[in-house]
Amino acid sequence: MKIINRTMRNKDRKIEVTHYVPASPKASIQIFHGMAEHKDRYRELLTYLALNDIHCVIYNQRGHGPDEKKEKLGHFDSFEDLLSDAKVVFRSMPADIPRFGLGHSMGSIVLRRLLADDLYDGAIIVGTGSKPNFKDLLSEKFLKVLSLIIPRKKLTSLNKLSFLGYDGNFKGREKNRWLNQDVSEIVKYNSDPYSGQNMSVKALSEILKNIRYVDRIRHIRRYKDIPYYLIGGADDPFSHFGRDLEVLRFRLGLHYSKVDLMLEPNARHEVLFEENKVGIYARIVKWVLDYEEK
């Protein structure tokens, strides 16, 4: 296995892309990290996949990671910019093997937008969620107006109200305990200078708008009939404790022939970082390579 770093450009933006390259790759996966984290957190997953003959491509999304200027951490102007970056990075994937997308949390929303563009041979949607209620519609409208007034402002109270007020579902004193039942992972996340940052009003507005957008039936109907693998924690409050994944499986199943769901018991939002993560990695490998062998 080799790790190769390269710089790509999307107009005036430099994108630092990392490839995990096996000696004889059988498939390739483009990974999209979640909100308020960065690509380096995924080293263990990427190493495992590469050691099992899966080529991996990852980069930091706008407003995230040490590549970003400090004043821009937690901010991006448009979800369309995230999609544009993703398509640039996609071009670096080898074209002679099956190409998959894997997105976690906010990254799953990016992936679900991209699925309408017929890029991938399969999709692994991890830790996704929905905001289907009337109060979510009101929140979307409120954030849209606020983003016109103070787009770059990062309000702690607004971040908690929008996405991060889930700790109350779990006993304990650790901040962000809703992410993971493994306390050591929570400690690492909370001590990471590039994880857990507040997002700007504009970024929150764009994220919420697109969470609601990707649930529209007319958007889902634009997908192609490729394999879909939905993965989440049964104790994840963002997915309403797995309900959103079950609803998405039903909706996809109305139109597409292969839709699989893995709801991991006792796992919270960051299912790829839970105590049983290696078992989850192994199931991802099997699912991808089963496709490659057909």
What are these regions (language model features)?
Residues 230-232:
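Short beta-strand/loop motif that positions the catalytic acidic residue
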Residues 75-93:
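Alpha/beta-hydrolase active-site loop
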Residues 41-70:
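Conserved alpha/beta-hydrolase
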